[in-house]
Amino acid sequence: MNNKSKRMSAAGLLIAIGIVYGDIGTSPLYVMKSIVKAMGGIGNVNREFIIGSISLVLWTVTLLTTLQTVIIALKATNHGEGGIFALYTLVRKRAKWLVLPALIGGAAILADGTLTPAVTVTTAIEGLKGLQLGGGVPVSSQSMVIAITVLILLVLFSIQKMGTSIIGKAFGPIMFVWFTFLGVIGLINMSGDWSILQAINPVYAIKLLFSPYNKAGIFILGSIFLATTGAEALYSDVGHVGKKNIIGSWPFVFVCLSLNYFGQGVWILNNPTYRPADGGVLNPFYEMIPSDFRLAAIILATIAAVIASQALITGSFTLVAEASGLKFLPRMKIDYPSTEKGQIYIPSINKGICVATIAIVLYFQTSAHMEAAYGLSITISMLMTTILLYEWLAMKKVNPVWNWIFLIFFGVLDIMFMISSLTKFTHGGYVSLFIAGAIGFIMYVWYYGNKIRDKREARNAYVRLDEYTDMLTNLSHDENYPTYATNLVYMANVKYNKFIKREILYSILDKRPKRAKAYWFVTVNVTNEPFTAEYAVNTYGTKNVINIQLYLGFKKQTSVNVYIRQIVHDLIADGTIEPQPQEYTTTPGRDVGDFSFVIVNDVISPQTQLIGYEKWLVEARVRLQNLSSNPASWFGLEYADTVIERVPLS
């Protein structure tokens, strides 16, 4: 999105409603259903319980979404970009251990990306079960619900490679209609008992936690927390829609959500003996809708659920790309299906989320069972975000008293919700923890495996590149050797602008002398700023040996092939390097020669001097490297002439 659309405007507000609020906007589909089910059904709840539950929902959303996210977290942006990884880049220099909450929180959010589509779409489709259409009941069993859900999810994941820029333009108007519908239907039901507004008083929320009518006790917070899942999207998507558009649109969304929860509460109070016609789990959201409008509501809810799922999938792609840039995950093949900035598609992640989401649907079978697994991982990510926000506030020199109040207040809240959600572990919560744990393990291995490798490399033989420039220049002009390439490009880490691994020069000079018109040594540096694209050049007084330091933002596409070609054009134009006129070419006036790229990868060998934990960690990292995409794709060199050379790690 361009900067103009990030300013608050009617269009910007509409776009924000379509992109940001899908997850939290579909929470009314299952929050009250989960709360009532936790009490054993509608017959086991009374007025005090319902008013207290609605109060807990409202104040949970107010504190965790409005106060912590909209008012506080949206201030902690990195050049306009938000999310847990952007927050980490702001504070990582304060302490090395801060990488742990970033890894844990990121893994938990990615795990949520597999659960949200399963829960929201299944819940929406369950509204069709038992509904009479044309004198019959087309969806008469849960098996049919599951079949329809899986079909919708398969279609959703299959269209990701085509991009969502076209259908994405409709998200805003559709979600605006959805939220308006939530508010209107809630207001209509509220008219049956305006005393439900007592729930605005937080005293009722506190009383419920200790009330004898509350059989679940404090653990009811596990169901209450579902109302605020999706709050993290307000922070992570701020770079797409702009801070002002989120701040401006949130009051409308919050009011519509509140009205709907009020309406569901009134319906429950007015129907204490109601039993669903199909004998299944009661869902107040659908039951409070007049039967004549039920089908339209289900269709709208399904579309909203798909939009919420789409937002989570797109967010997962972005999160993985950021994690790769920060060396939390292996680099993966990234496609750009649209010219729209920031829209990416990662085939391997799309397949992984698709398989995991459908497996969750098939395993749990009902949305009620899925809700048992839902929310646990997000409580963990919120606690990690609170820790990082505390460090950010300290970095900003906020009064230490207020900073500690923030940490204690929100830390205690997050821990309470996490403890209450732990009761879900045996009822399916282990699934979300397993997924988050697997992702976190991969991140840990990759990050710390790289750290150990880099530490070993620092002890290995490095040579000064500037001491070999004469030899490289002579080889470049030595016609006794065939030309290997016009431009020979090594993806090499040149430290302090002059030190390079001996193996790289060995590859050029000793292995089989590689003659080239120009030798390029390219280092890719990931910056804290999200969209940096800069470079620095050092030719060491030659026209044949060039050290390029690329500085790319952690959200920037790593297309080294494209960048290097442009740099060559620039350096030829200003006379820094020799011209490369092409006598034989299909492109008239072509002044840049061919390119050959070389990537040197480390491998574990019997000579590798590693033992115990460090050896295991580096070996695991190498296995992950082998399982991930071709190293050429890491640097955007899939279609370039690229050679992978392997050298043993000493």
Swiss-Prot record:
Q: Which reaction does it catalyse?
A: K(+)(in) + H(+)(in) = K(+)(out) + H(+)(out)
Q: Pfam families of this UniProt entry? A: K_trans, K_trans_C
Q: Which GO terms describe its molecular function?
A: potassium ion transmembrane transporter activity; symporter activity
Membrane topology (UniProt): Multi-pass membrane protein
Query: Could you tell me which InterPro entries the record lists for this protein?
Result: K+_transporter, K_trans_C, K_trans_N, Kup
Q: Where in the cell is it found?
A: Cell membrane
Q: Which family does it belong to?
A: Belongs to the HAK/KUP transporter (TC 2.A.72) family.
The task this protein performs is described as: Transport of potassium into the cell. Likely operates as a K(+):H(+) symporter.
- The entry's protein name is Probable potassium transport system protein Kup 1
Q: What is the native source organism of this protein?
A: Lactobacillus acidophilus (strain ATCC 700396 / NCK56 / N2 / NCFM)
